[in-house]
Curated annotation (Swiss-Prot):
Record-annotated membrane-spanning stretches: 6-26, 357-377, 428-448, 505-525
InterPro entries named in the record: Membr_insert_YidC (IPR019998), Membr_insert_YidC_N (IPR028053), YidC/ALB3/OXA1/COX18 (IPR001708), YidC/Oxa/ALB_C (IPR028055), YidC_ALB_C (IPR047196), YidC_periplasmic_sf (IPR038221)
Organism the protein comes from: Nitrosococcus oceani (strain ATCC 19707 / BCRC 17464 / JCM 30415 / NCIMB 11848 / C-107)
GO biological process terms, semicolon-separated: protein insertion into membrane; protein transport
Coarse class of the protein's main subcellular location: membrane
Subcellular localization: Cell inner membrane
Any one Gene Ontology molecular-function term assigned to this protein's record: membrane insertase activity
Function according to Swiss-Prot or TrEMBL: Required for the insertion and/or proper folding and/or complex formation of integral membrane proteins into the membrane. Involved in integration of membrane proteins that insert both dependently and independently of the Sec translocase complex, as well as at least some lipoproteins. Aids folding of multispanning membrane proteins.
Protein name, per record: Membrane protein insertase YidC
Amino acid sequence: MENYRLILFSALVLVLFLMWDAWQTDYGPIPLLPPPPQPTASSGESSPVLPEAVPDAPPPEMADMDTAPILTGQKTIEVKTDLLAIKIGMASGDLYEVQLLNYPVSLKKPNEPVTLLHKRDPDLFVTQSGLRAASGPSITHETVQFSAPKTYYELIEDESSLKVPLTWEDENGIKVTKTYIFQRDSYQIDLNIKIENGTDQAWMGRAYAQFSRTPPESGGMFARSYVGAVFSTQEQEYQKVDFGDLASQSFDRRSSGGWVAMIQHYFVAAWVPREQGTNYYYGKHVQNSRYIAGVMPPQQTIAPGESGQFNLALFTGPKIQDQLAAVAPKLNLTVDYGKLTILAEPLFWLMSWFHNLVGNWGWAIVLLTFVVKLVFFKLSQTSYRSMARMRKLQPRLLALKERYGDDRQKVGQAMMELYRKEKVNPMGGCLPIVVQIPVFIALYWMLLESVELRQAPFIFWIQDLTSKDPYYILPLLMGVSMFVQQKLSPAPTDPIQAKVMALMPVMFTVFFVMFPAGLVLYWVVNNILSIAQQWYITRQIEQEG
């Protein structure tokens, strides 16, 4: 039973390994994708049309929506709001560049904003939208050239919203107007697609809105985050579908409500249909290492002389939970806390409350650590009392080992008898700590996923809580604090176990060298509080005699 601390140590190492592996999955290098399946000879090259009389059937015309190359040198409309700088291509009427003005690329480049949507060869991430018709002309991002009254729009100080209309009209009397609506202090962009039918025949079809994306090149460790599609449907409210999945099998679902998004670390772009009825969600590999993920709202029929419209919302911005939740139900799940969301969300709420109180995310983490320590105070007290009693028994345990030598059975029996006599539970110090592990894991994911901590300073040399400590001071302090904790705990009687336990601070220091400073800060503060509590309880036990 004296091996309990070695078991606990092994459990903690396993937890760290699993966290490291999970980090590599979502924040490590992106793996090479399998080659996409080749089309068979019978599949043909042309795009099939939308089934005219079967609106509930899968709309197969989306299969080749992205075969046209992205046009370069096209005429551009530039839009600037208080939060966004946007470029819209007139050749398709779609957004091909979105810059987030309040989010610099790095602390070293404070005047260079993050570019979420872009077309930087070979990396591509753009929106595409249009109309696919079963009866009448299709107006797609591949086939039309829009016009606009101006080429530059800016949301001025006394305006709360800004409209950017783009129009296209054919010789037969079909007129399409795409209107983008921007709001002050918002990353949501509303898109209204209006169809005016000036012909003598009904127009029937669907709108589509999608993302076209190439997987970013693989970077070094911690250089890349998970990049991929996410769908929310009635069947599954949050479903990741990465590029590897789409390379091997296309995605299609029908659902009322829902949304489709492309996510990456800290930022998200999402299409949200606003029409009533059943939406069709899809994703697939197309060509030139490009992937699409999108949605088609329900089909509409527009009689001659009438007009109709499709409405969608586009969110392009940081993963700020309350803003995401206001755009669409469950969109806040793109802030992915993993399987322990039920614990991570209240922890984030409490940390945010502390930030509003003190105005610094680093001090908010410190205060959050105090609260977590207070919640587990009684459990920790039980653990440290058990350790203190074990420490008092240490000389007698060593005497038993000397008396019985290599007879492990007799040593074990004698130790158990001593534990019963002194009313000491050798596992009493283990269970309370194990119970706290889920909370630590929830804190881990909460600190990693919170865009609010991105480039947030603490004090002195810590200028970004989401980056590693540039001078490794916090990891070293953590190692020292763990070493001090060990000195307050009973040493293992087995020499091999003693050597393994002695390596524990070194191993944890190495593990945490590359972890974000905010997470290491939590661990350091937690260790310091644990040392104070353990020292106080140990002194009490020793004074009791």
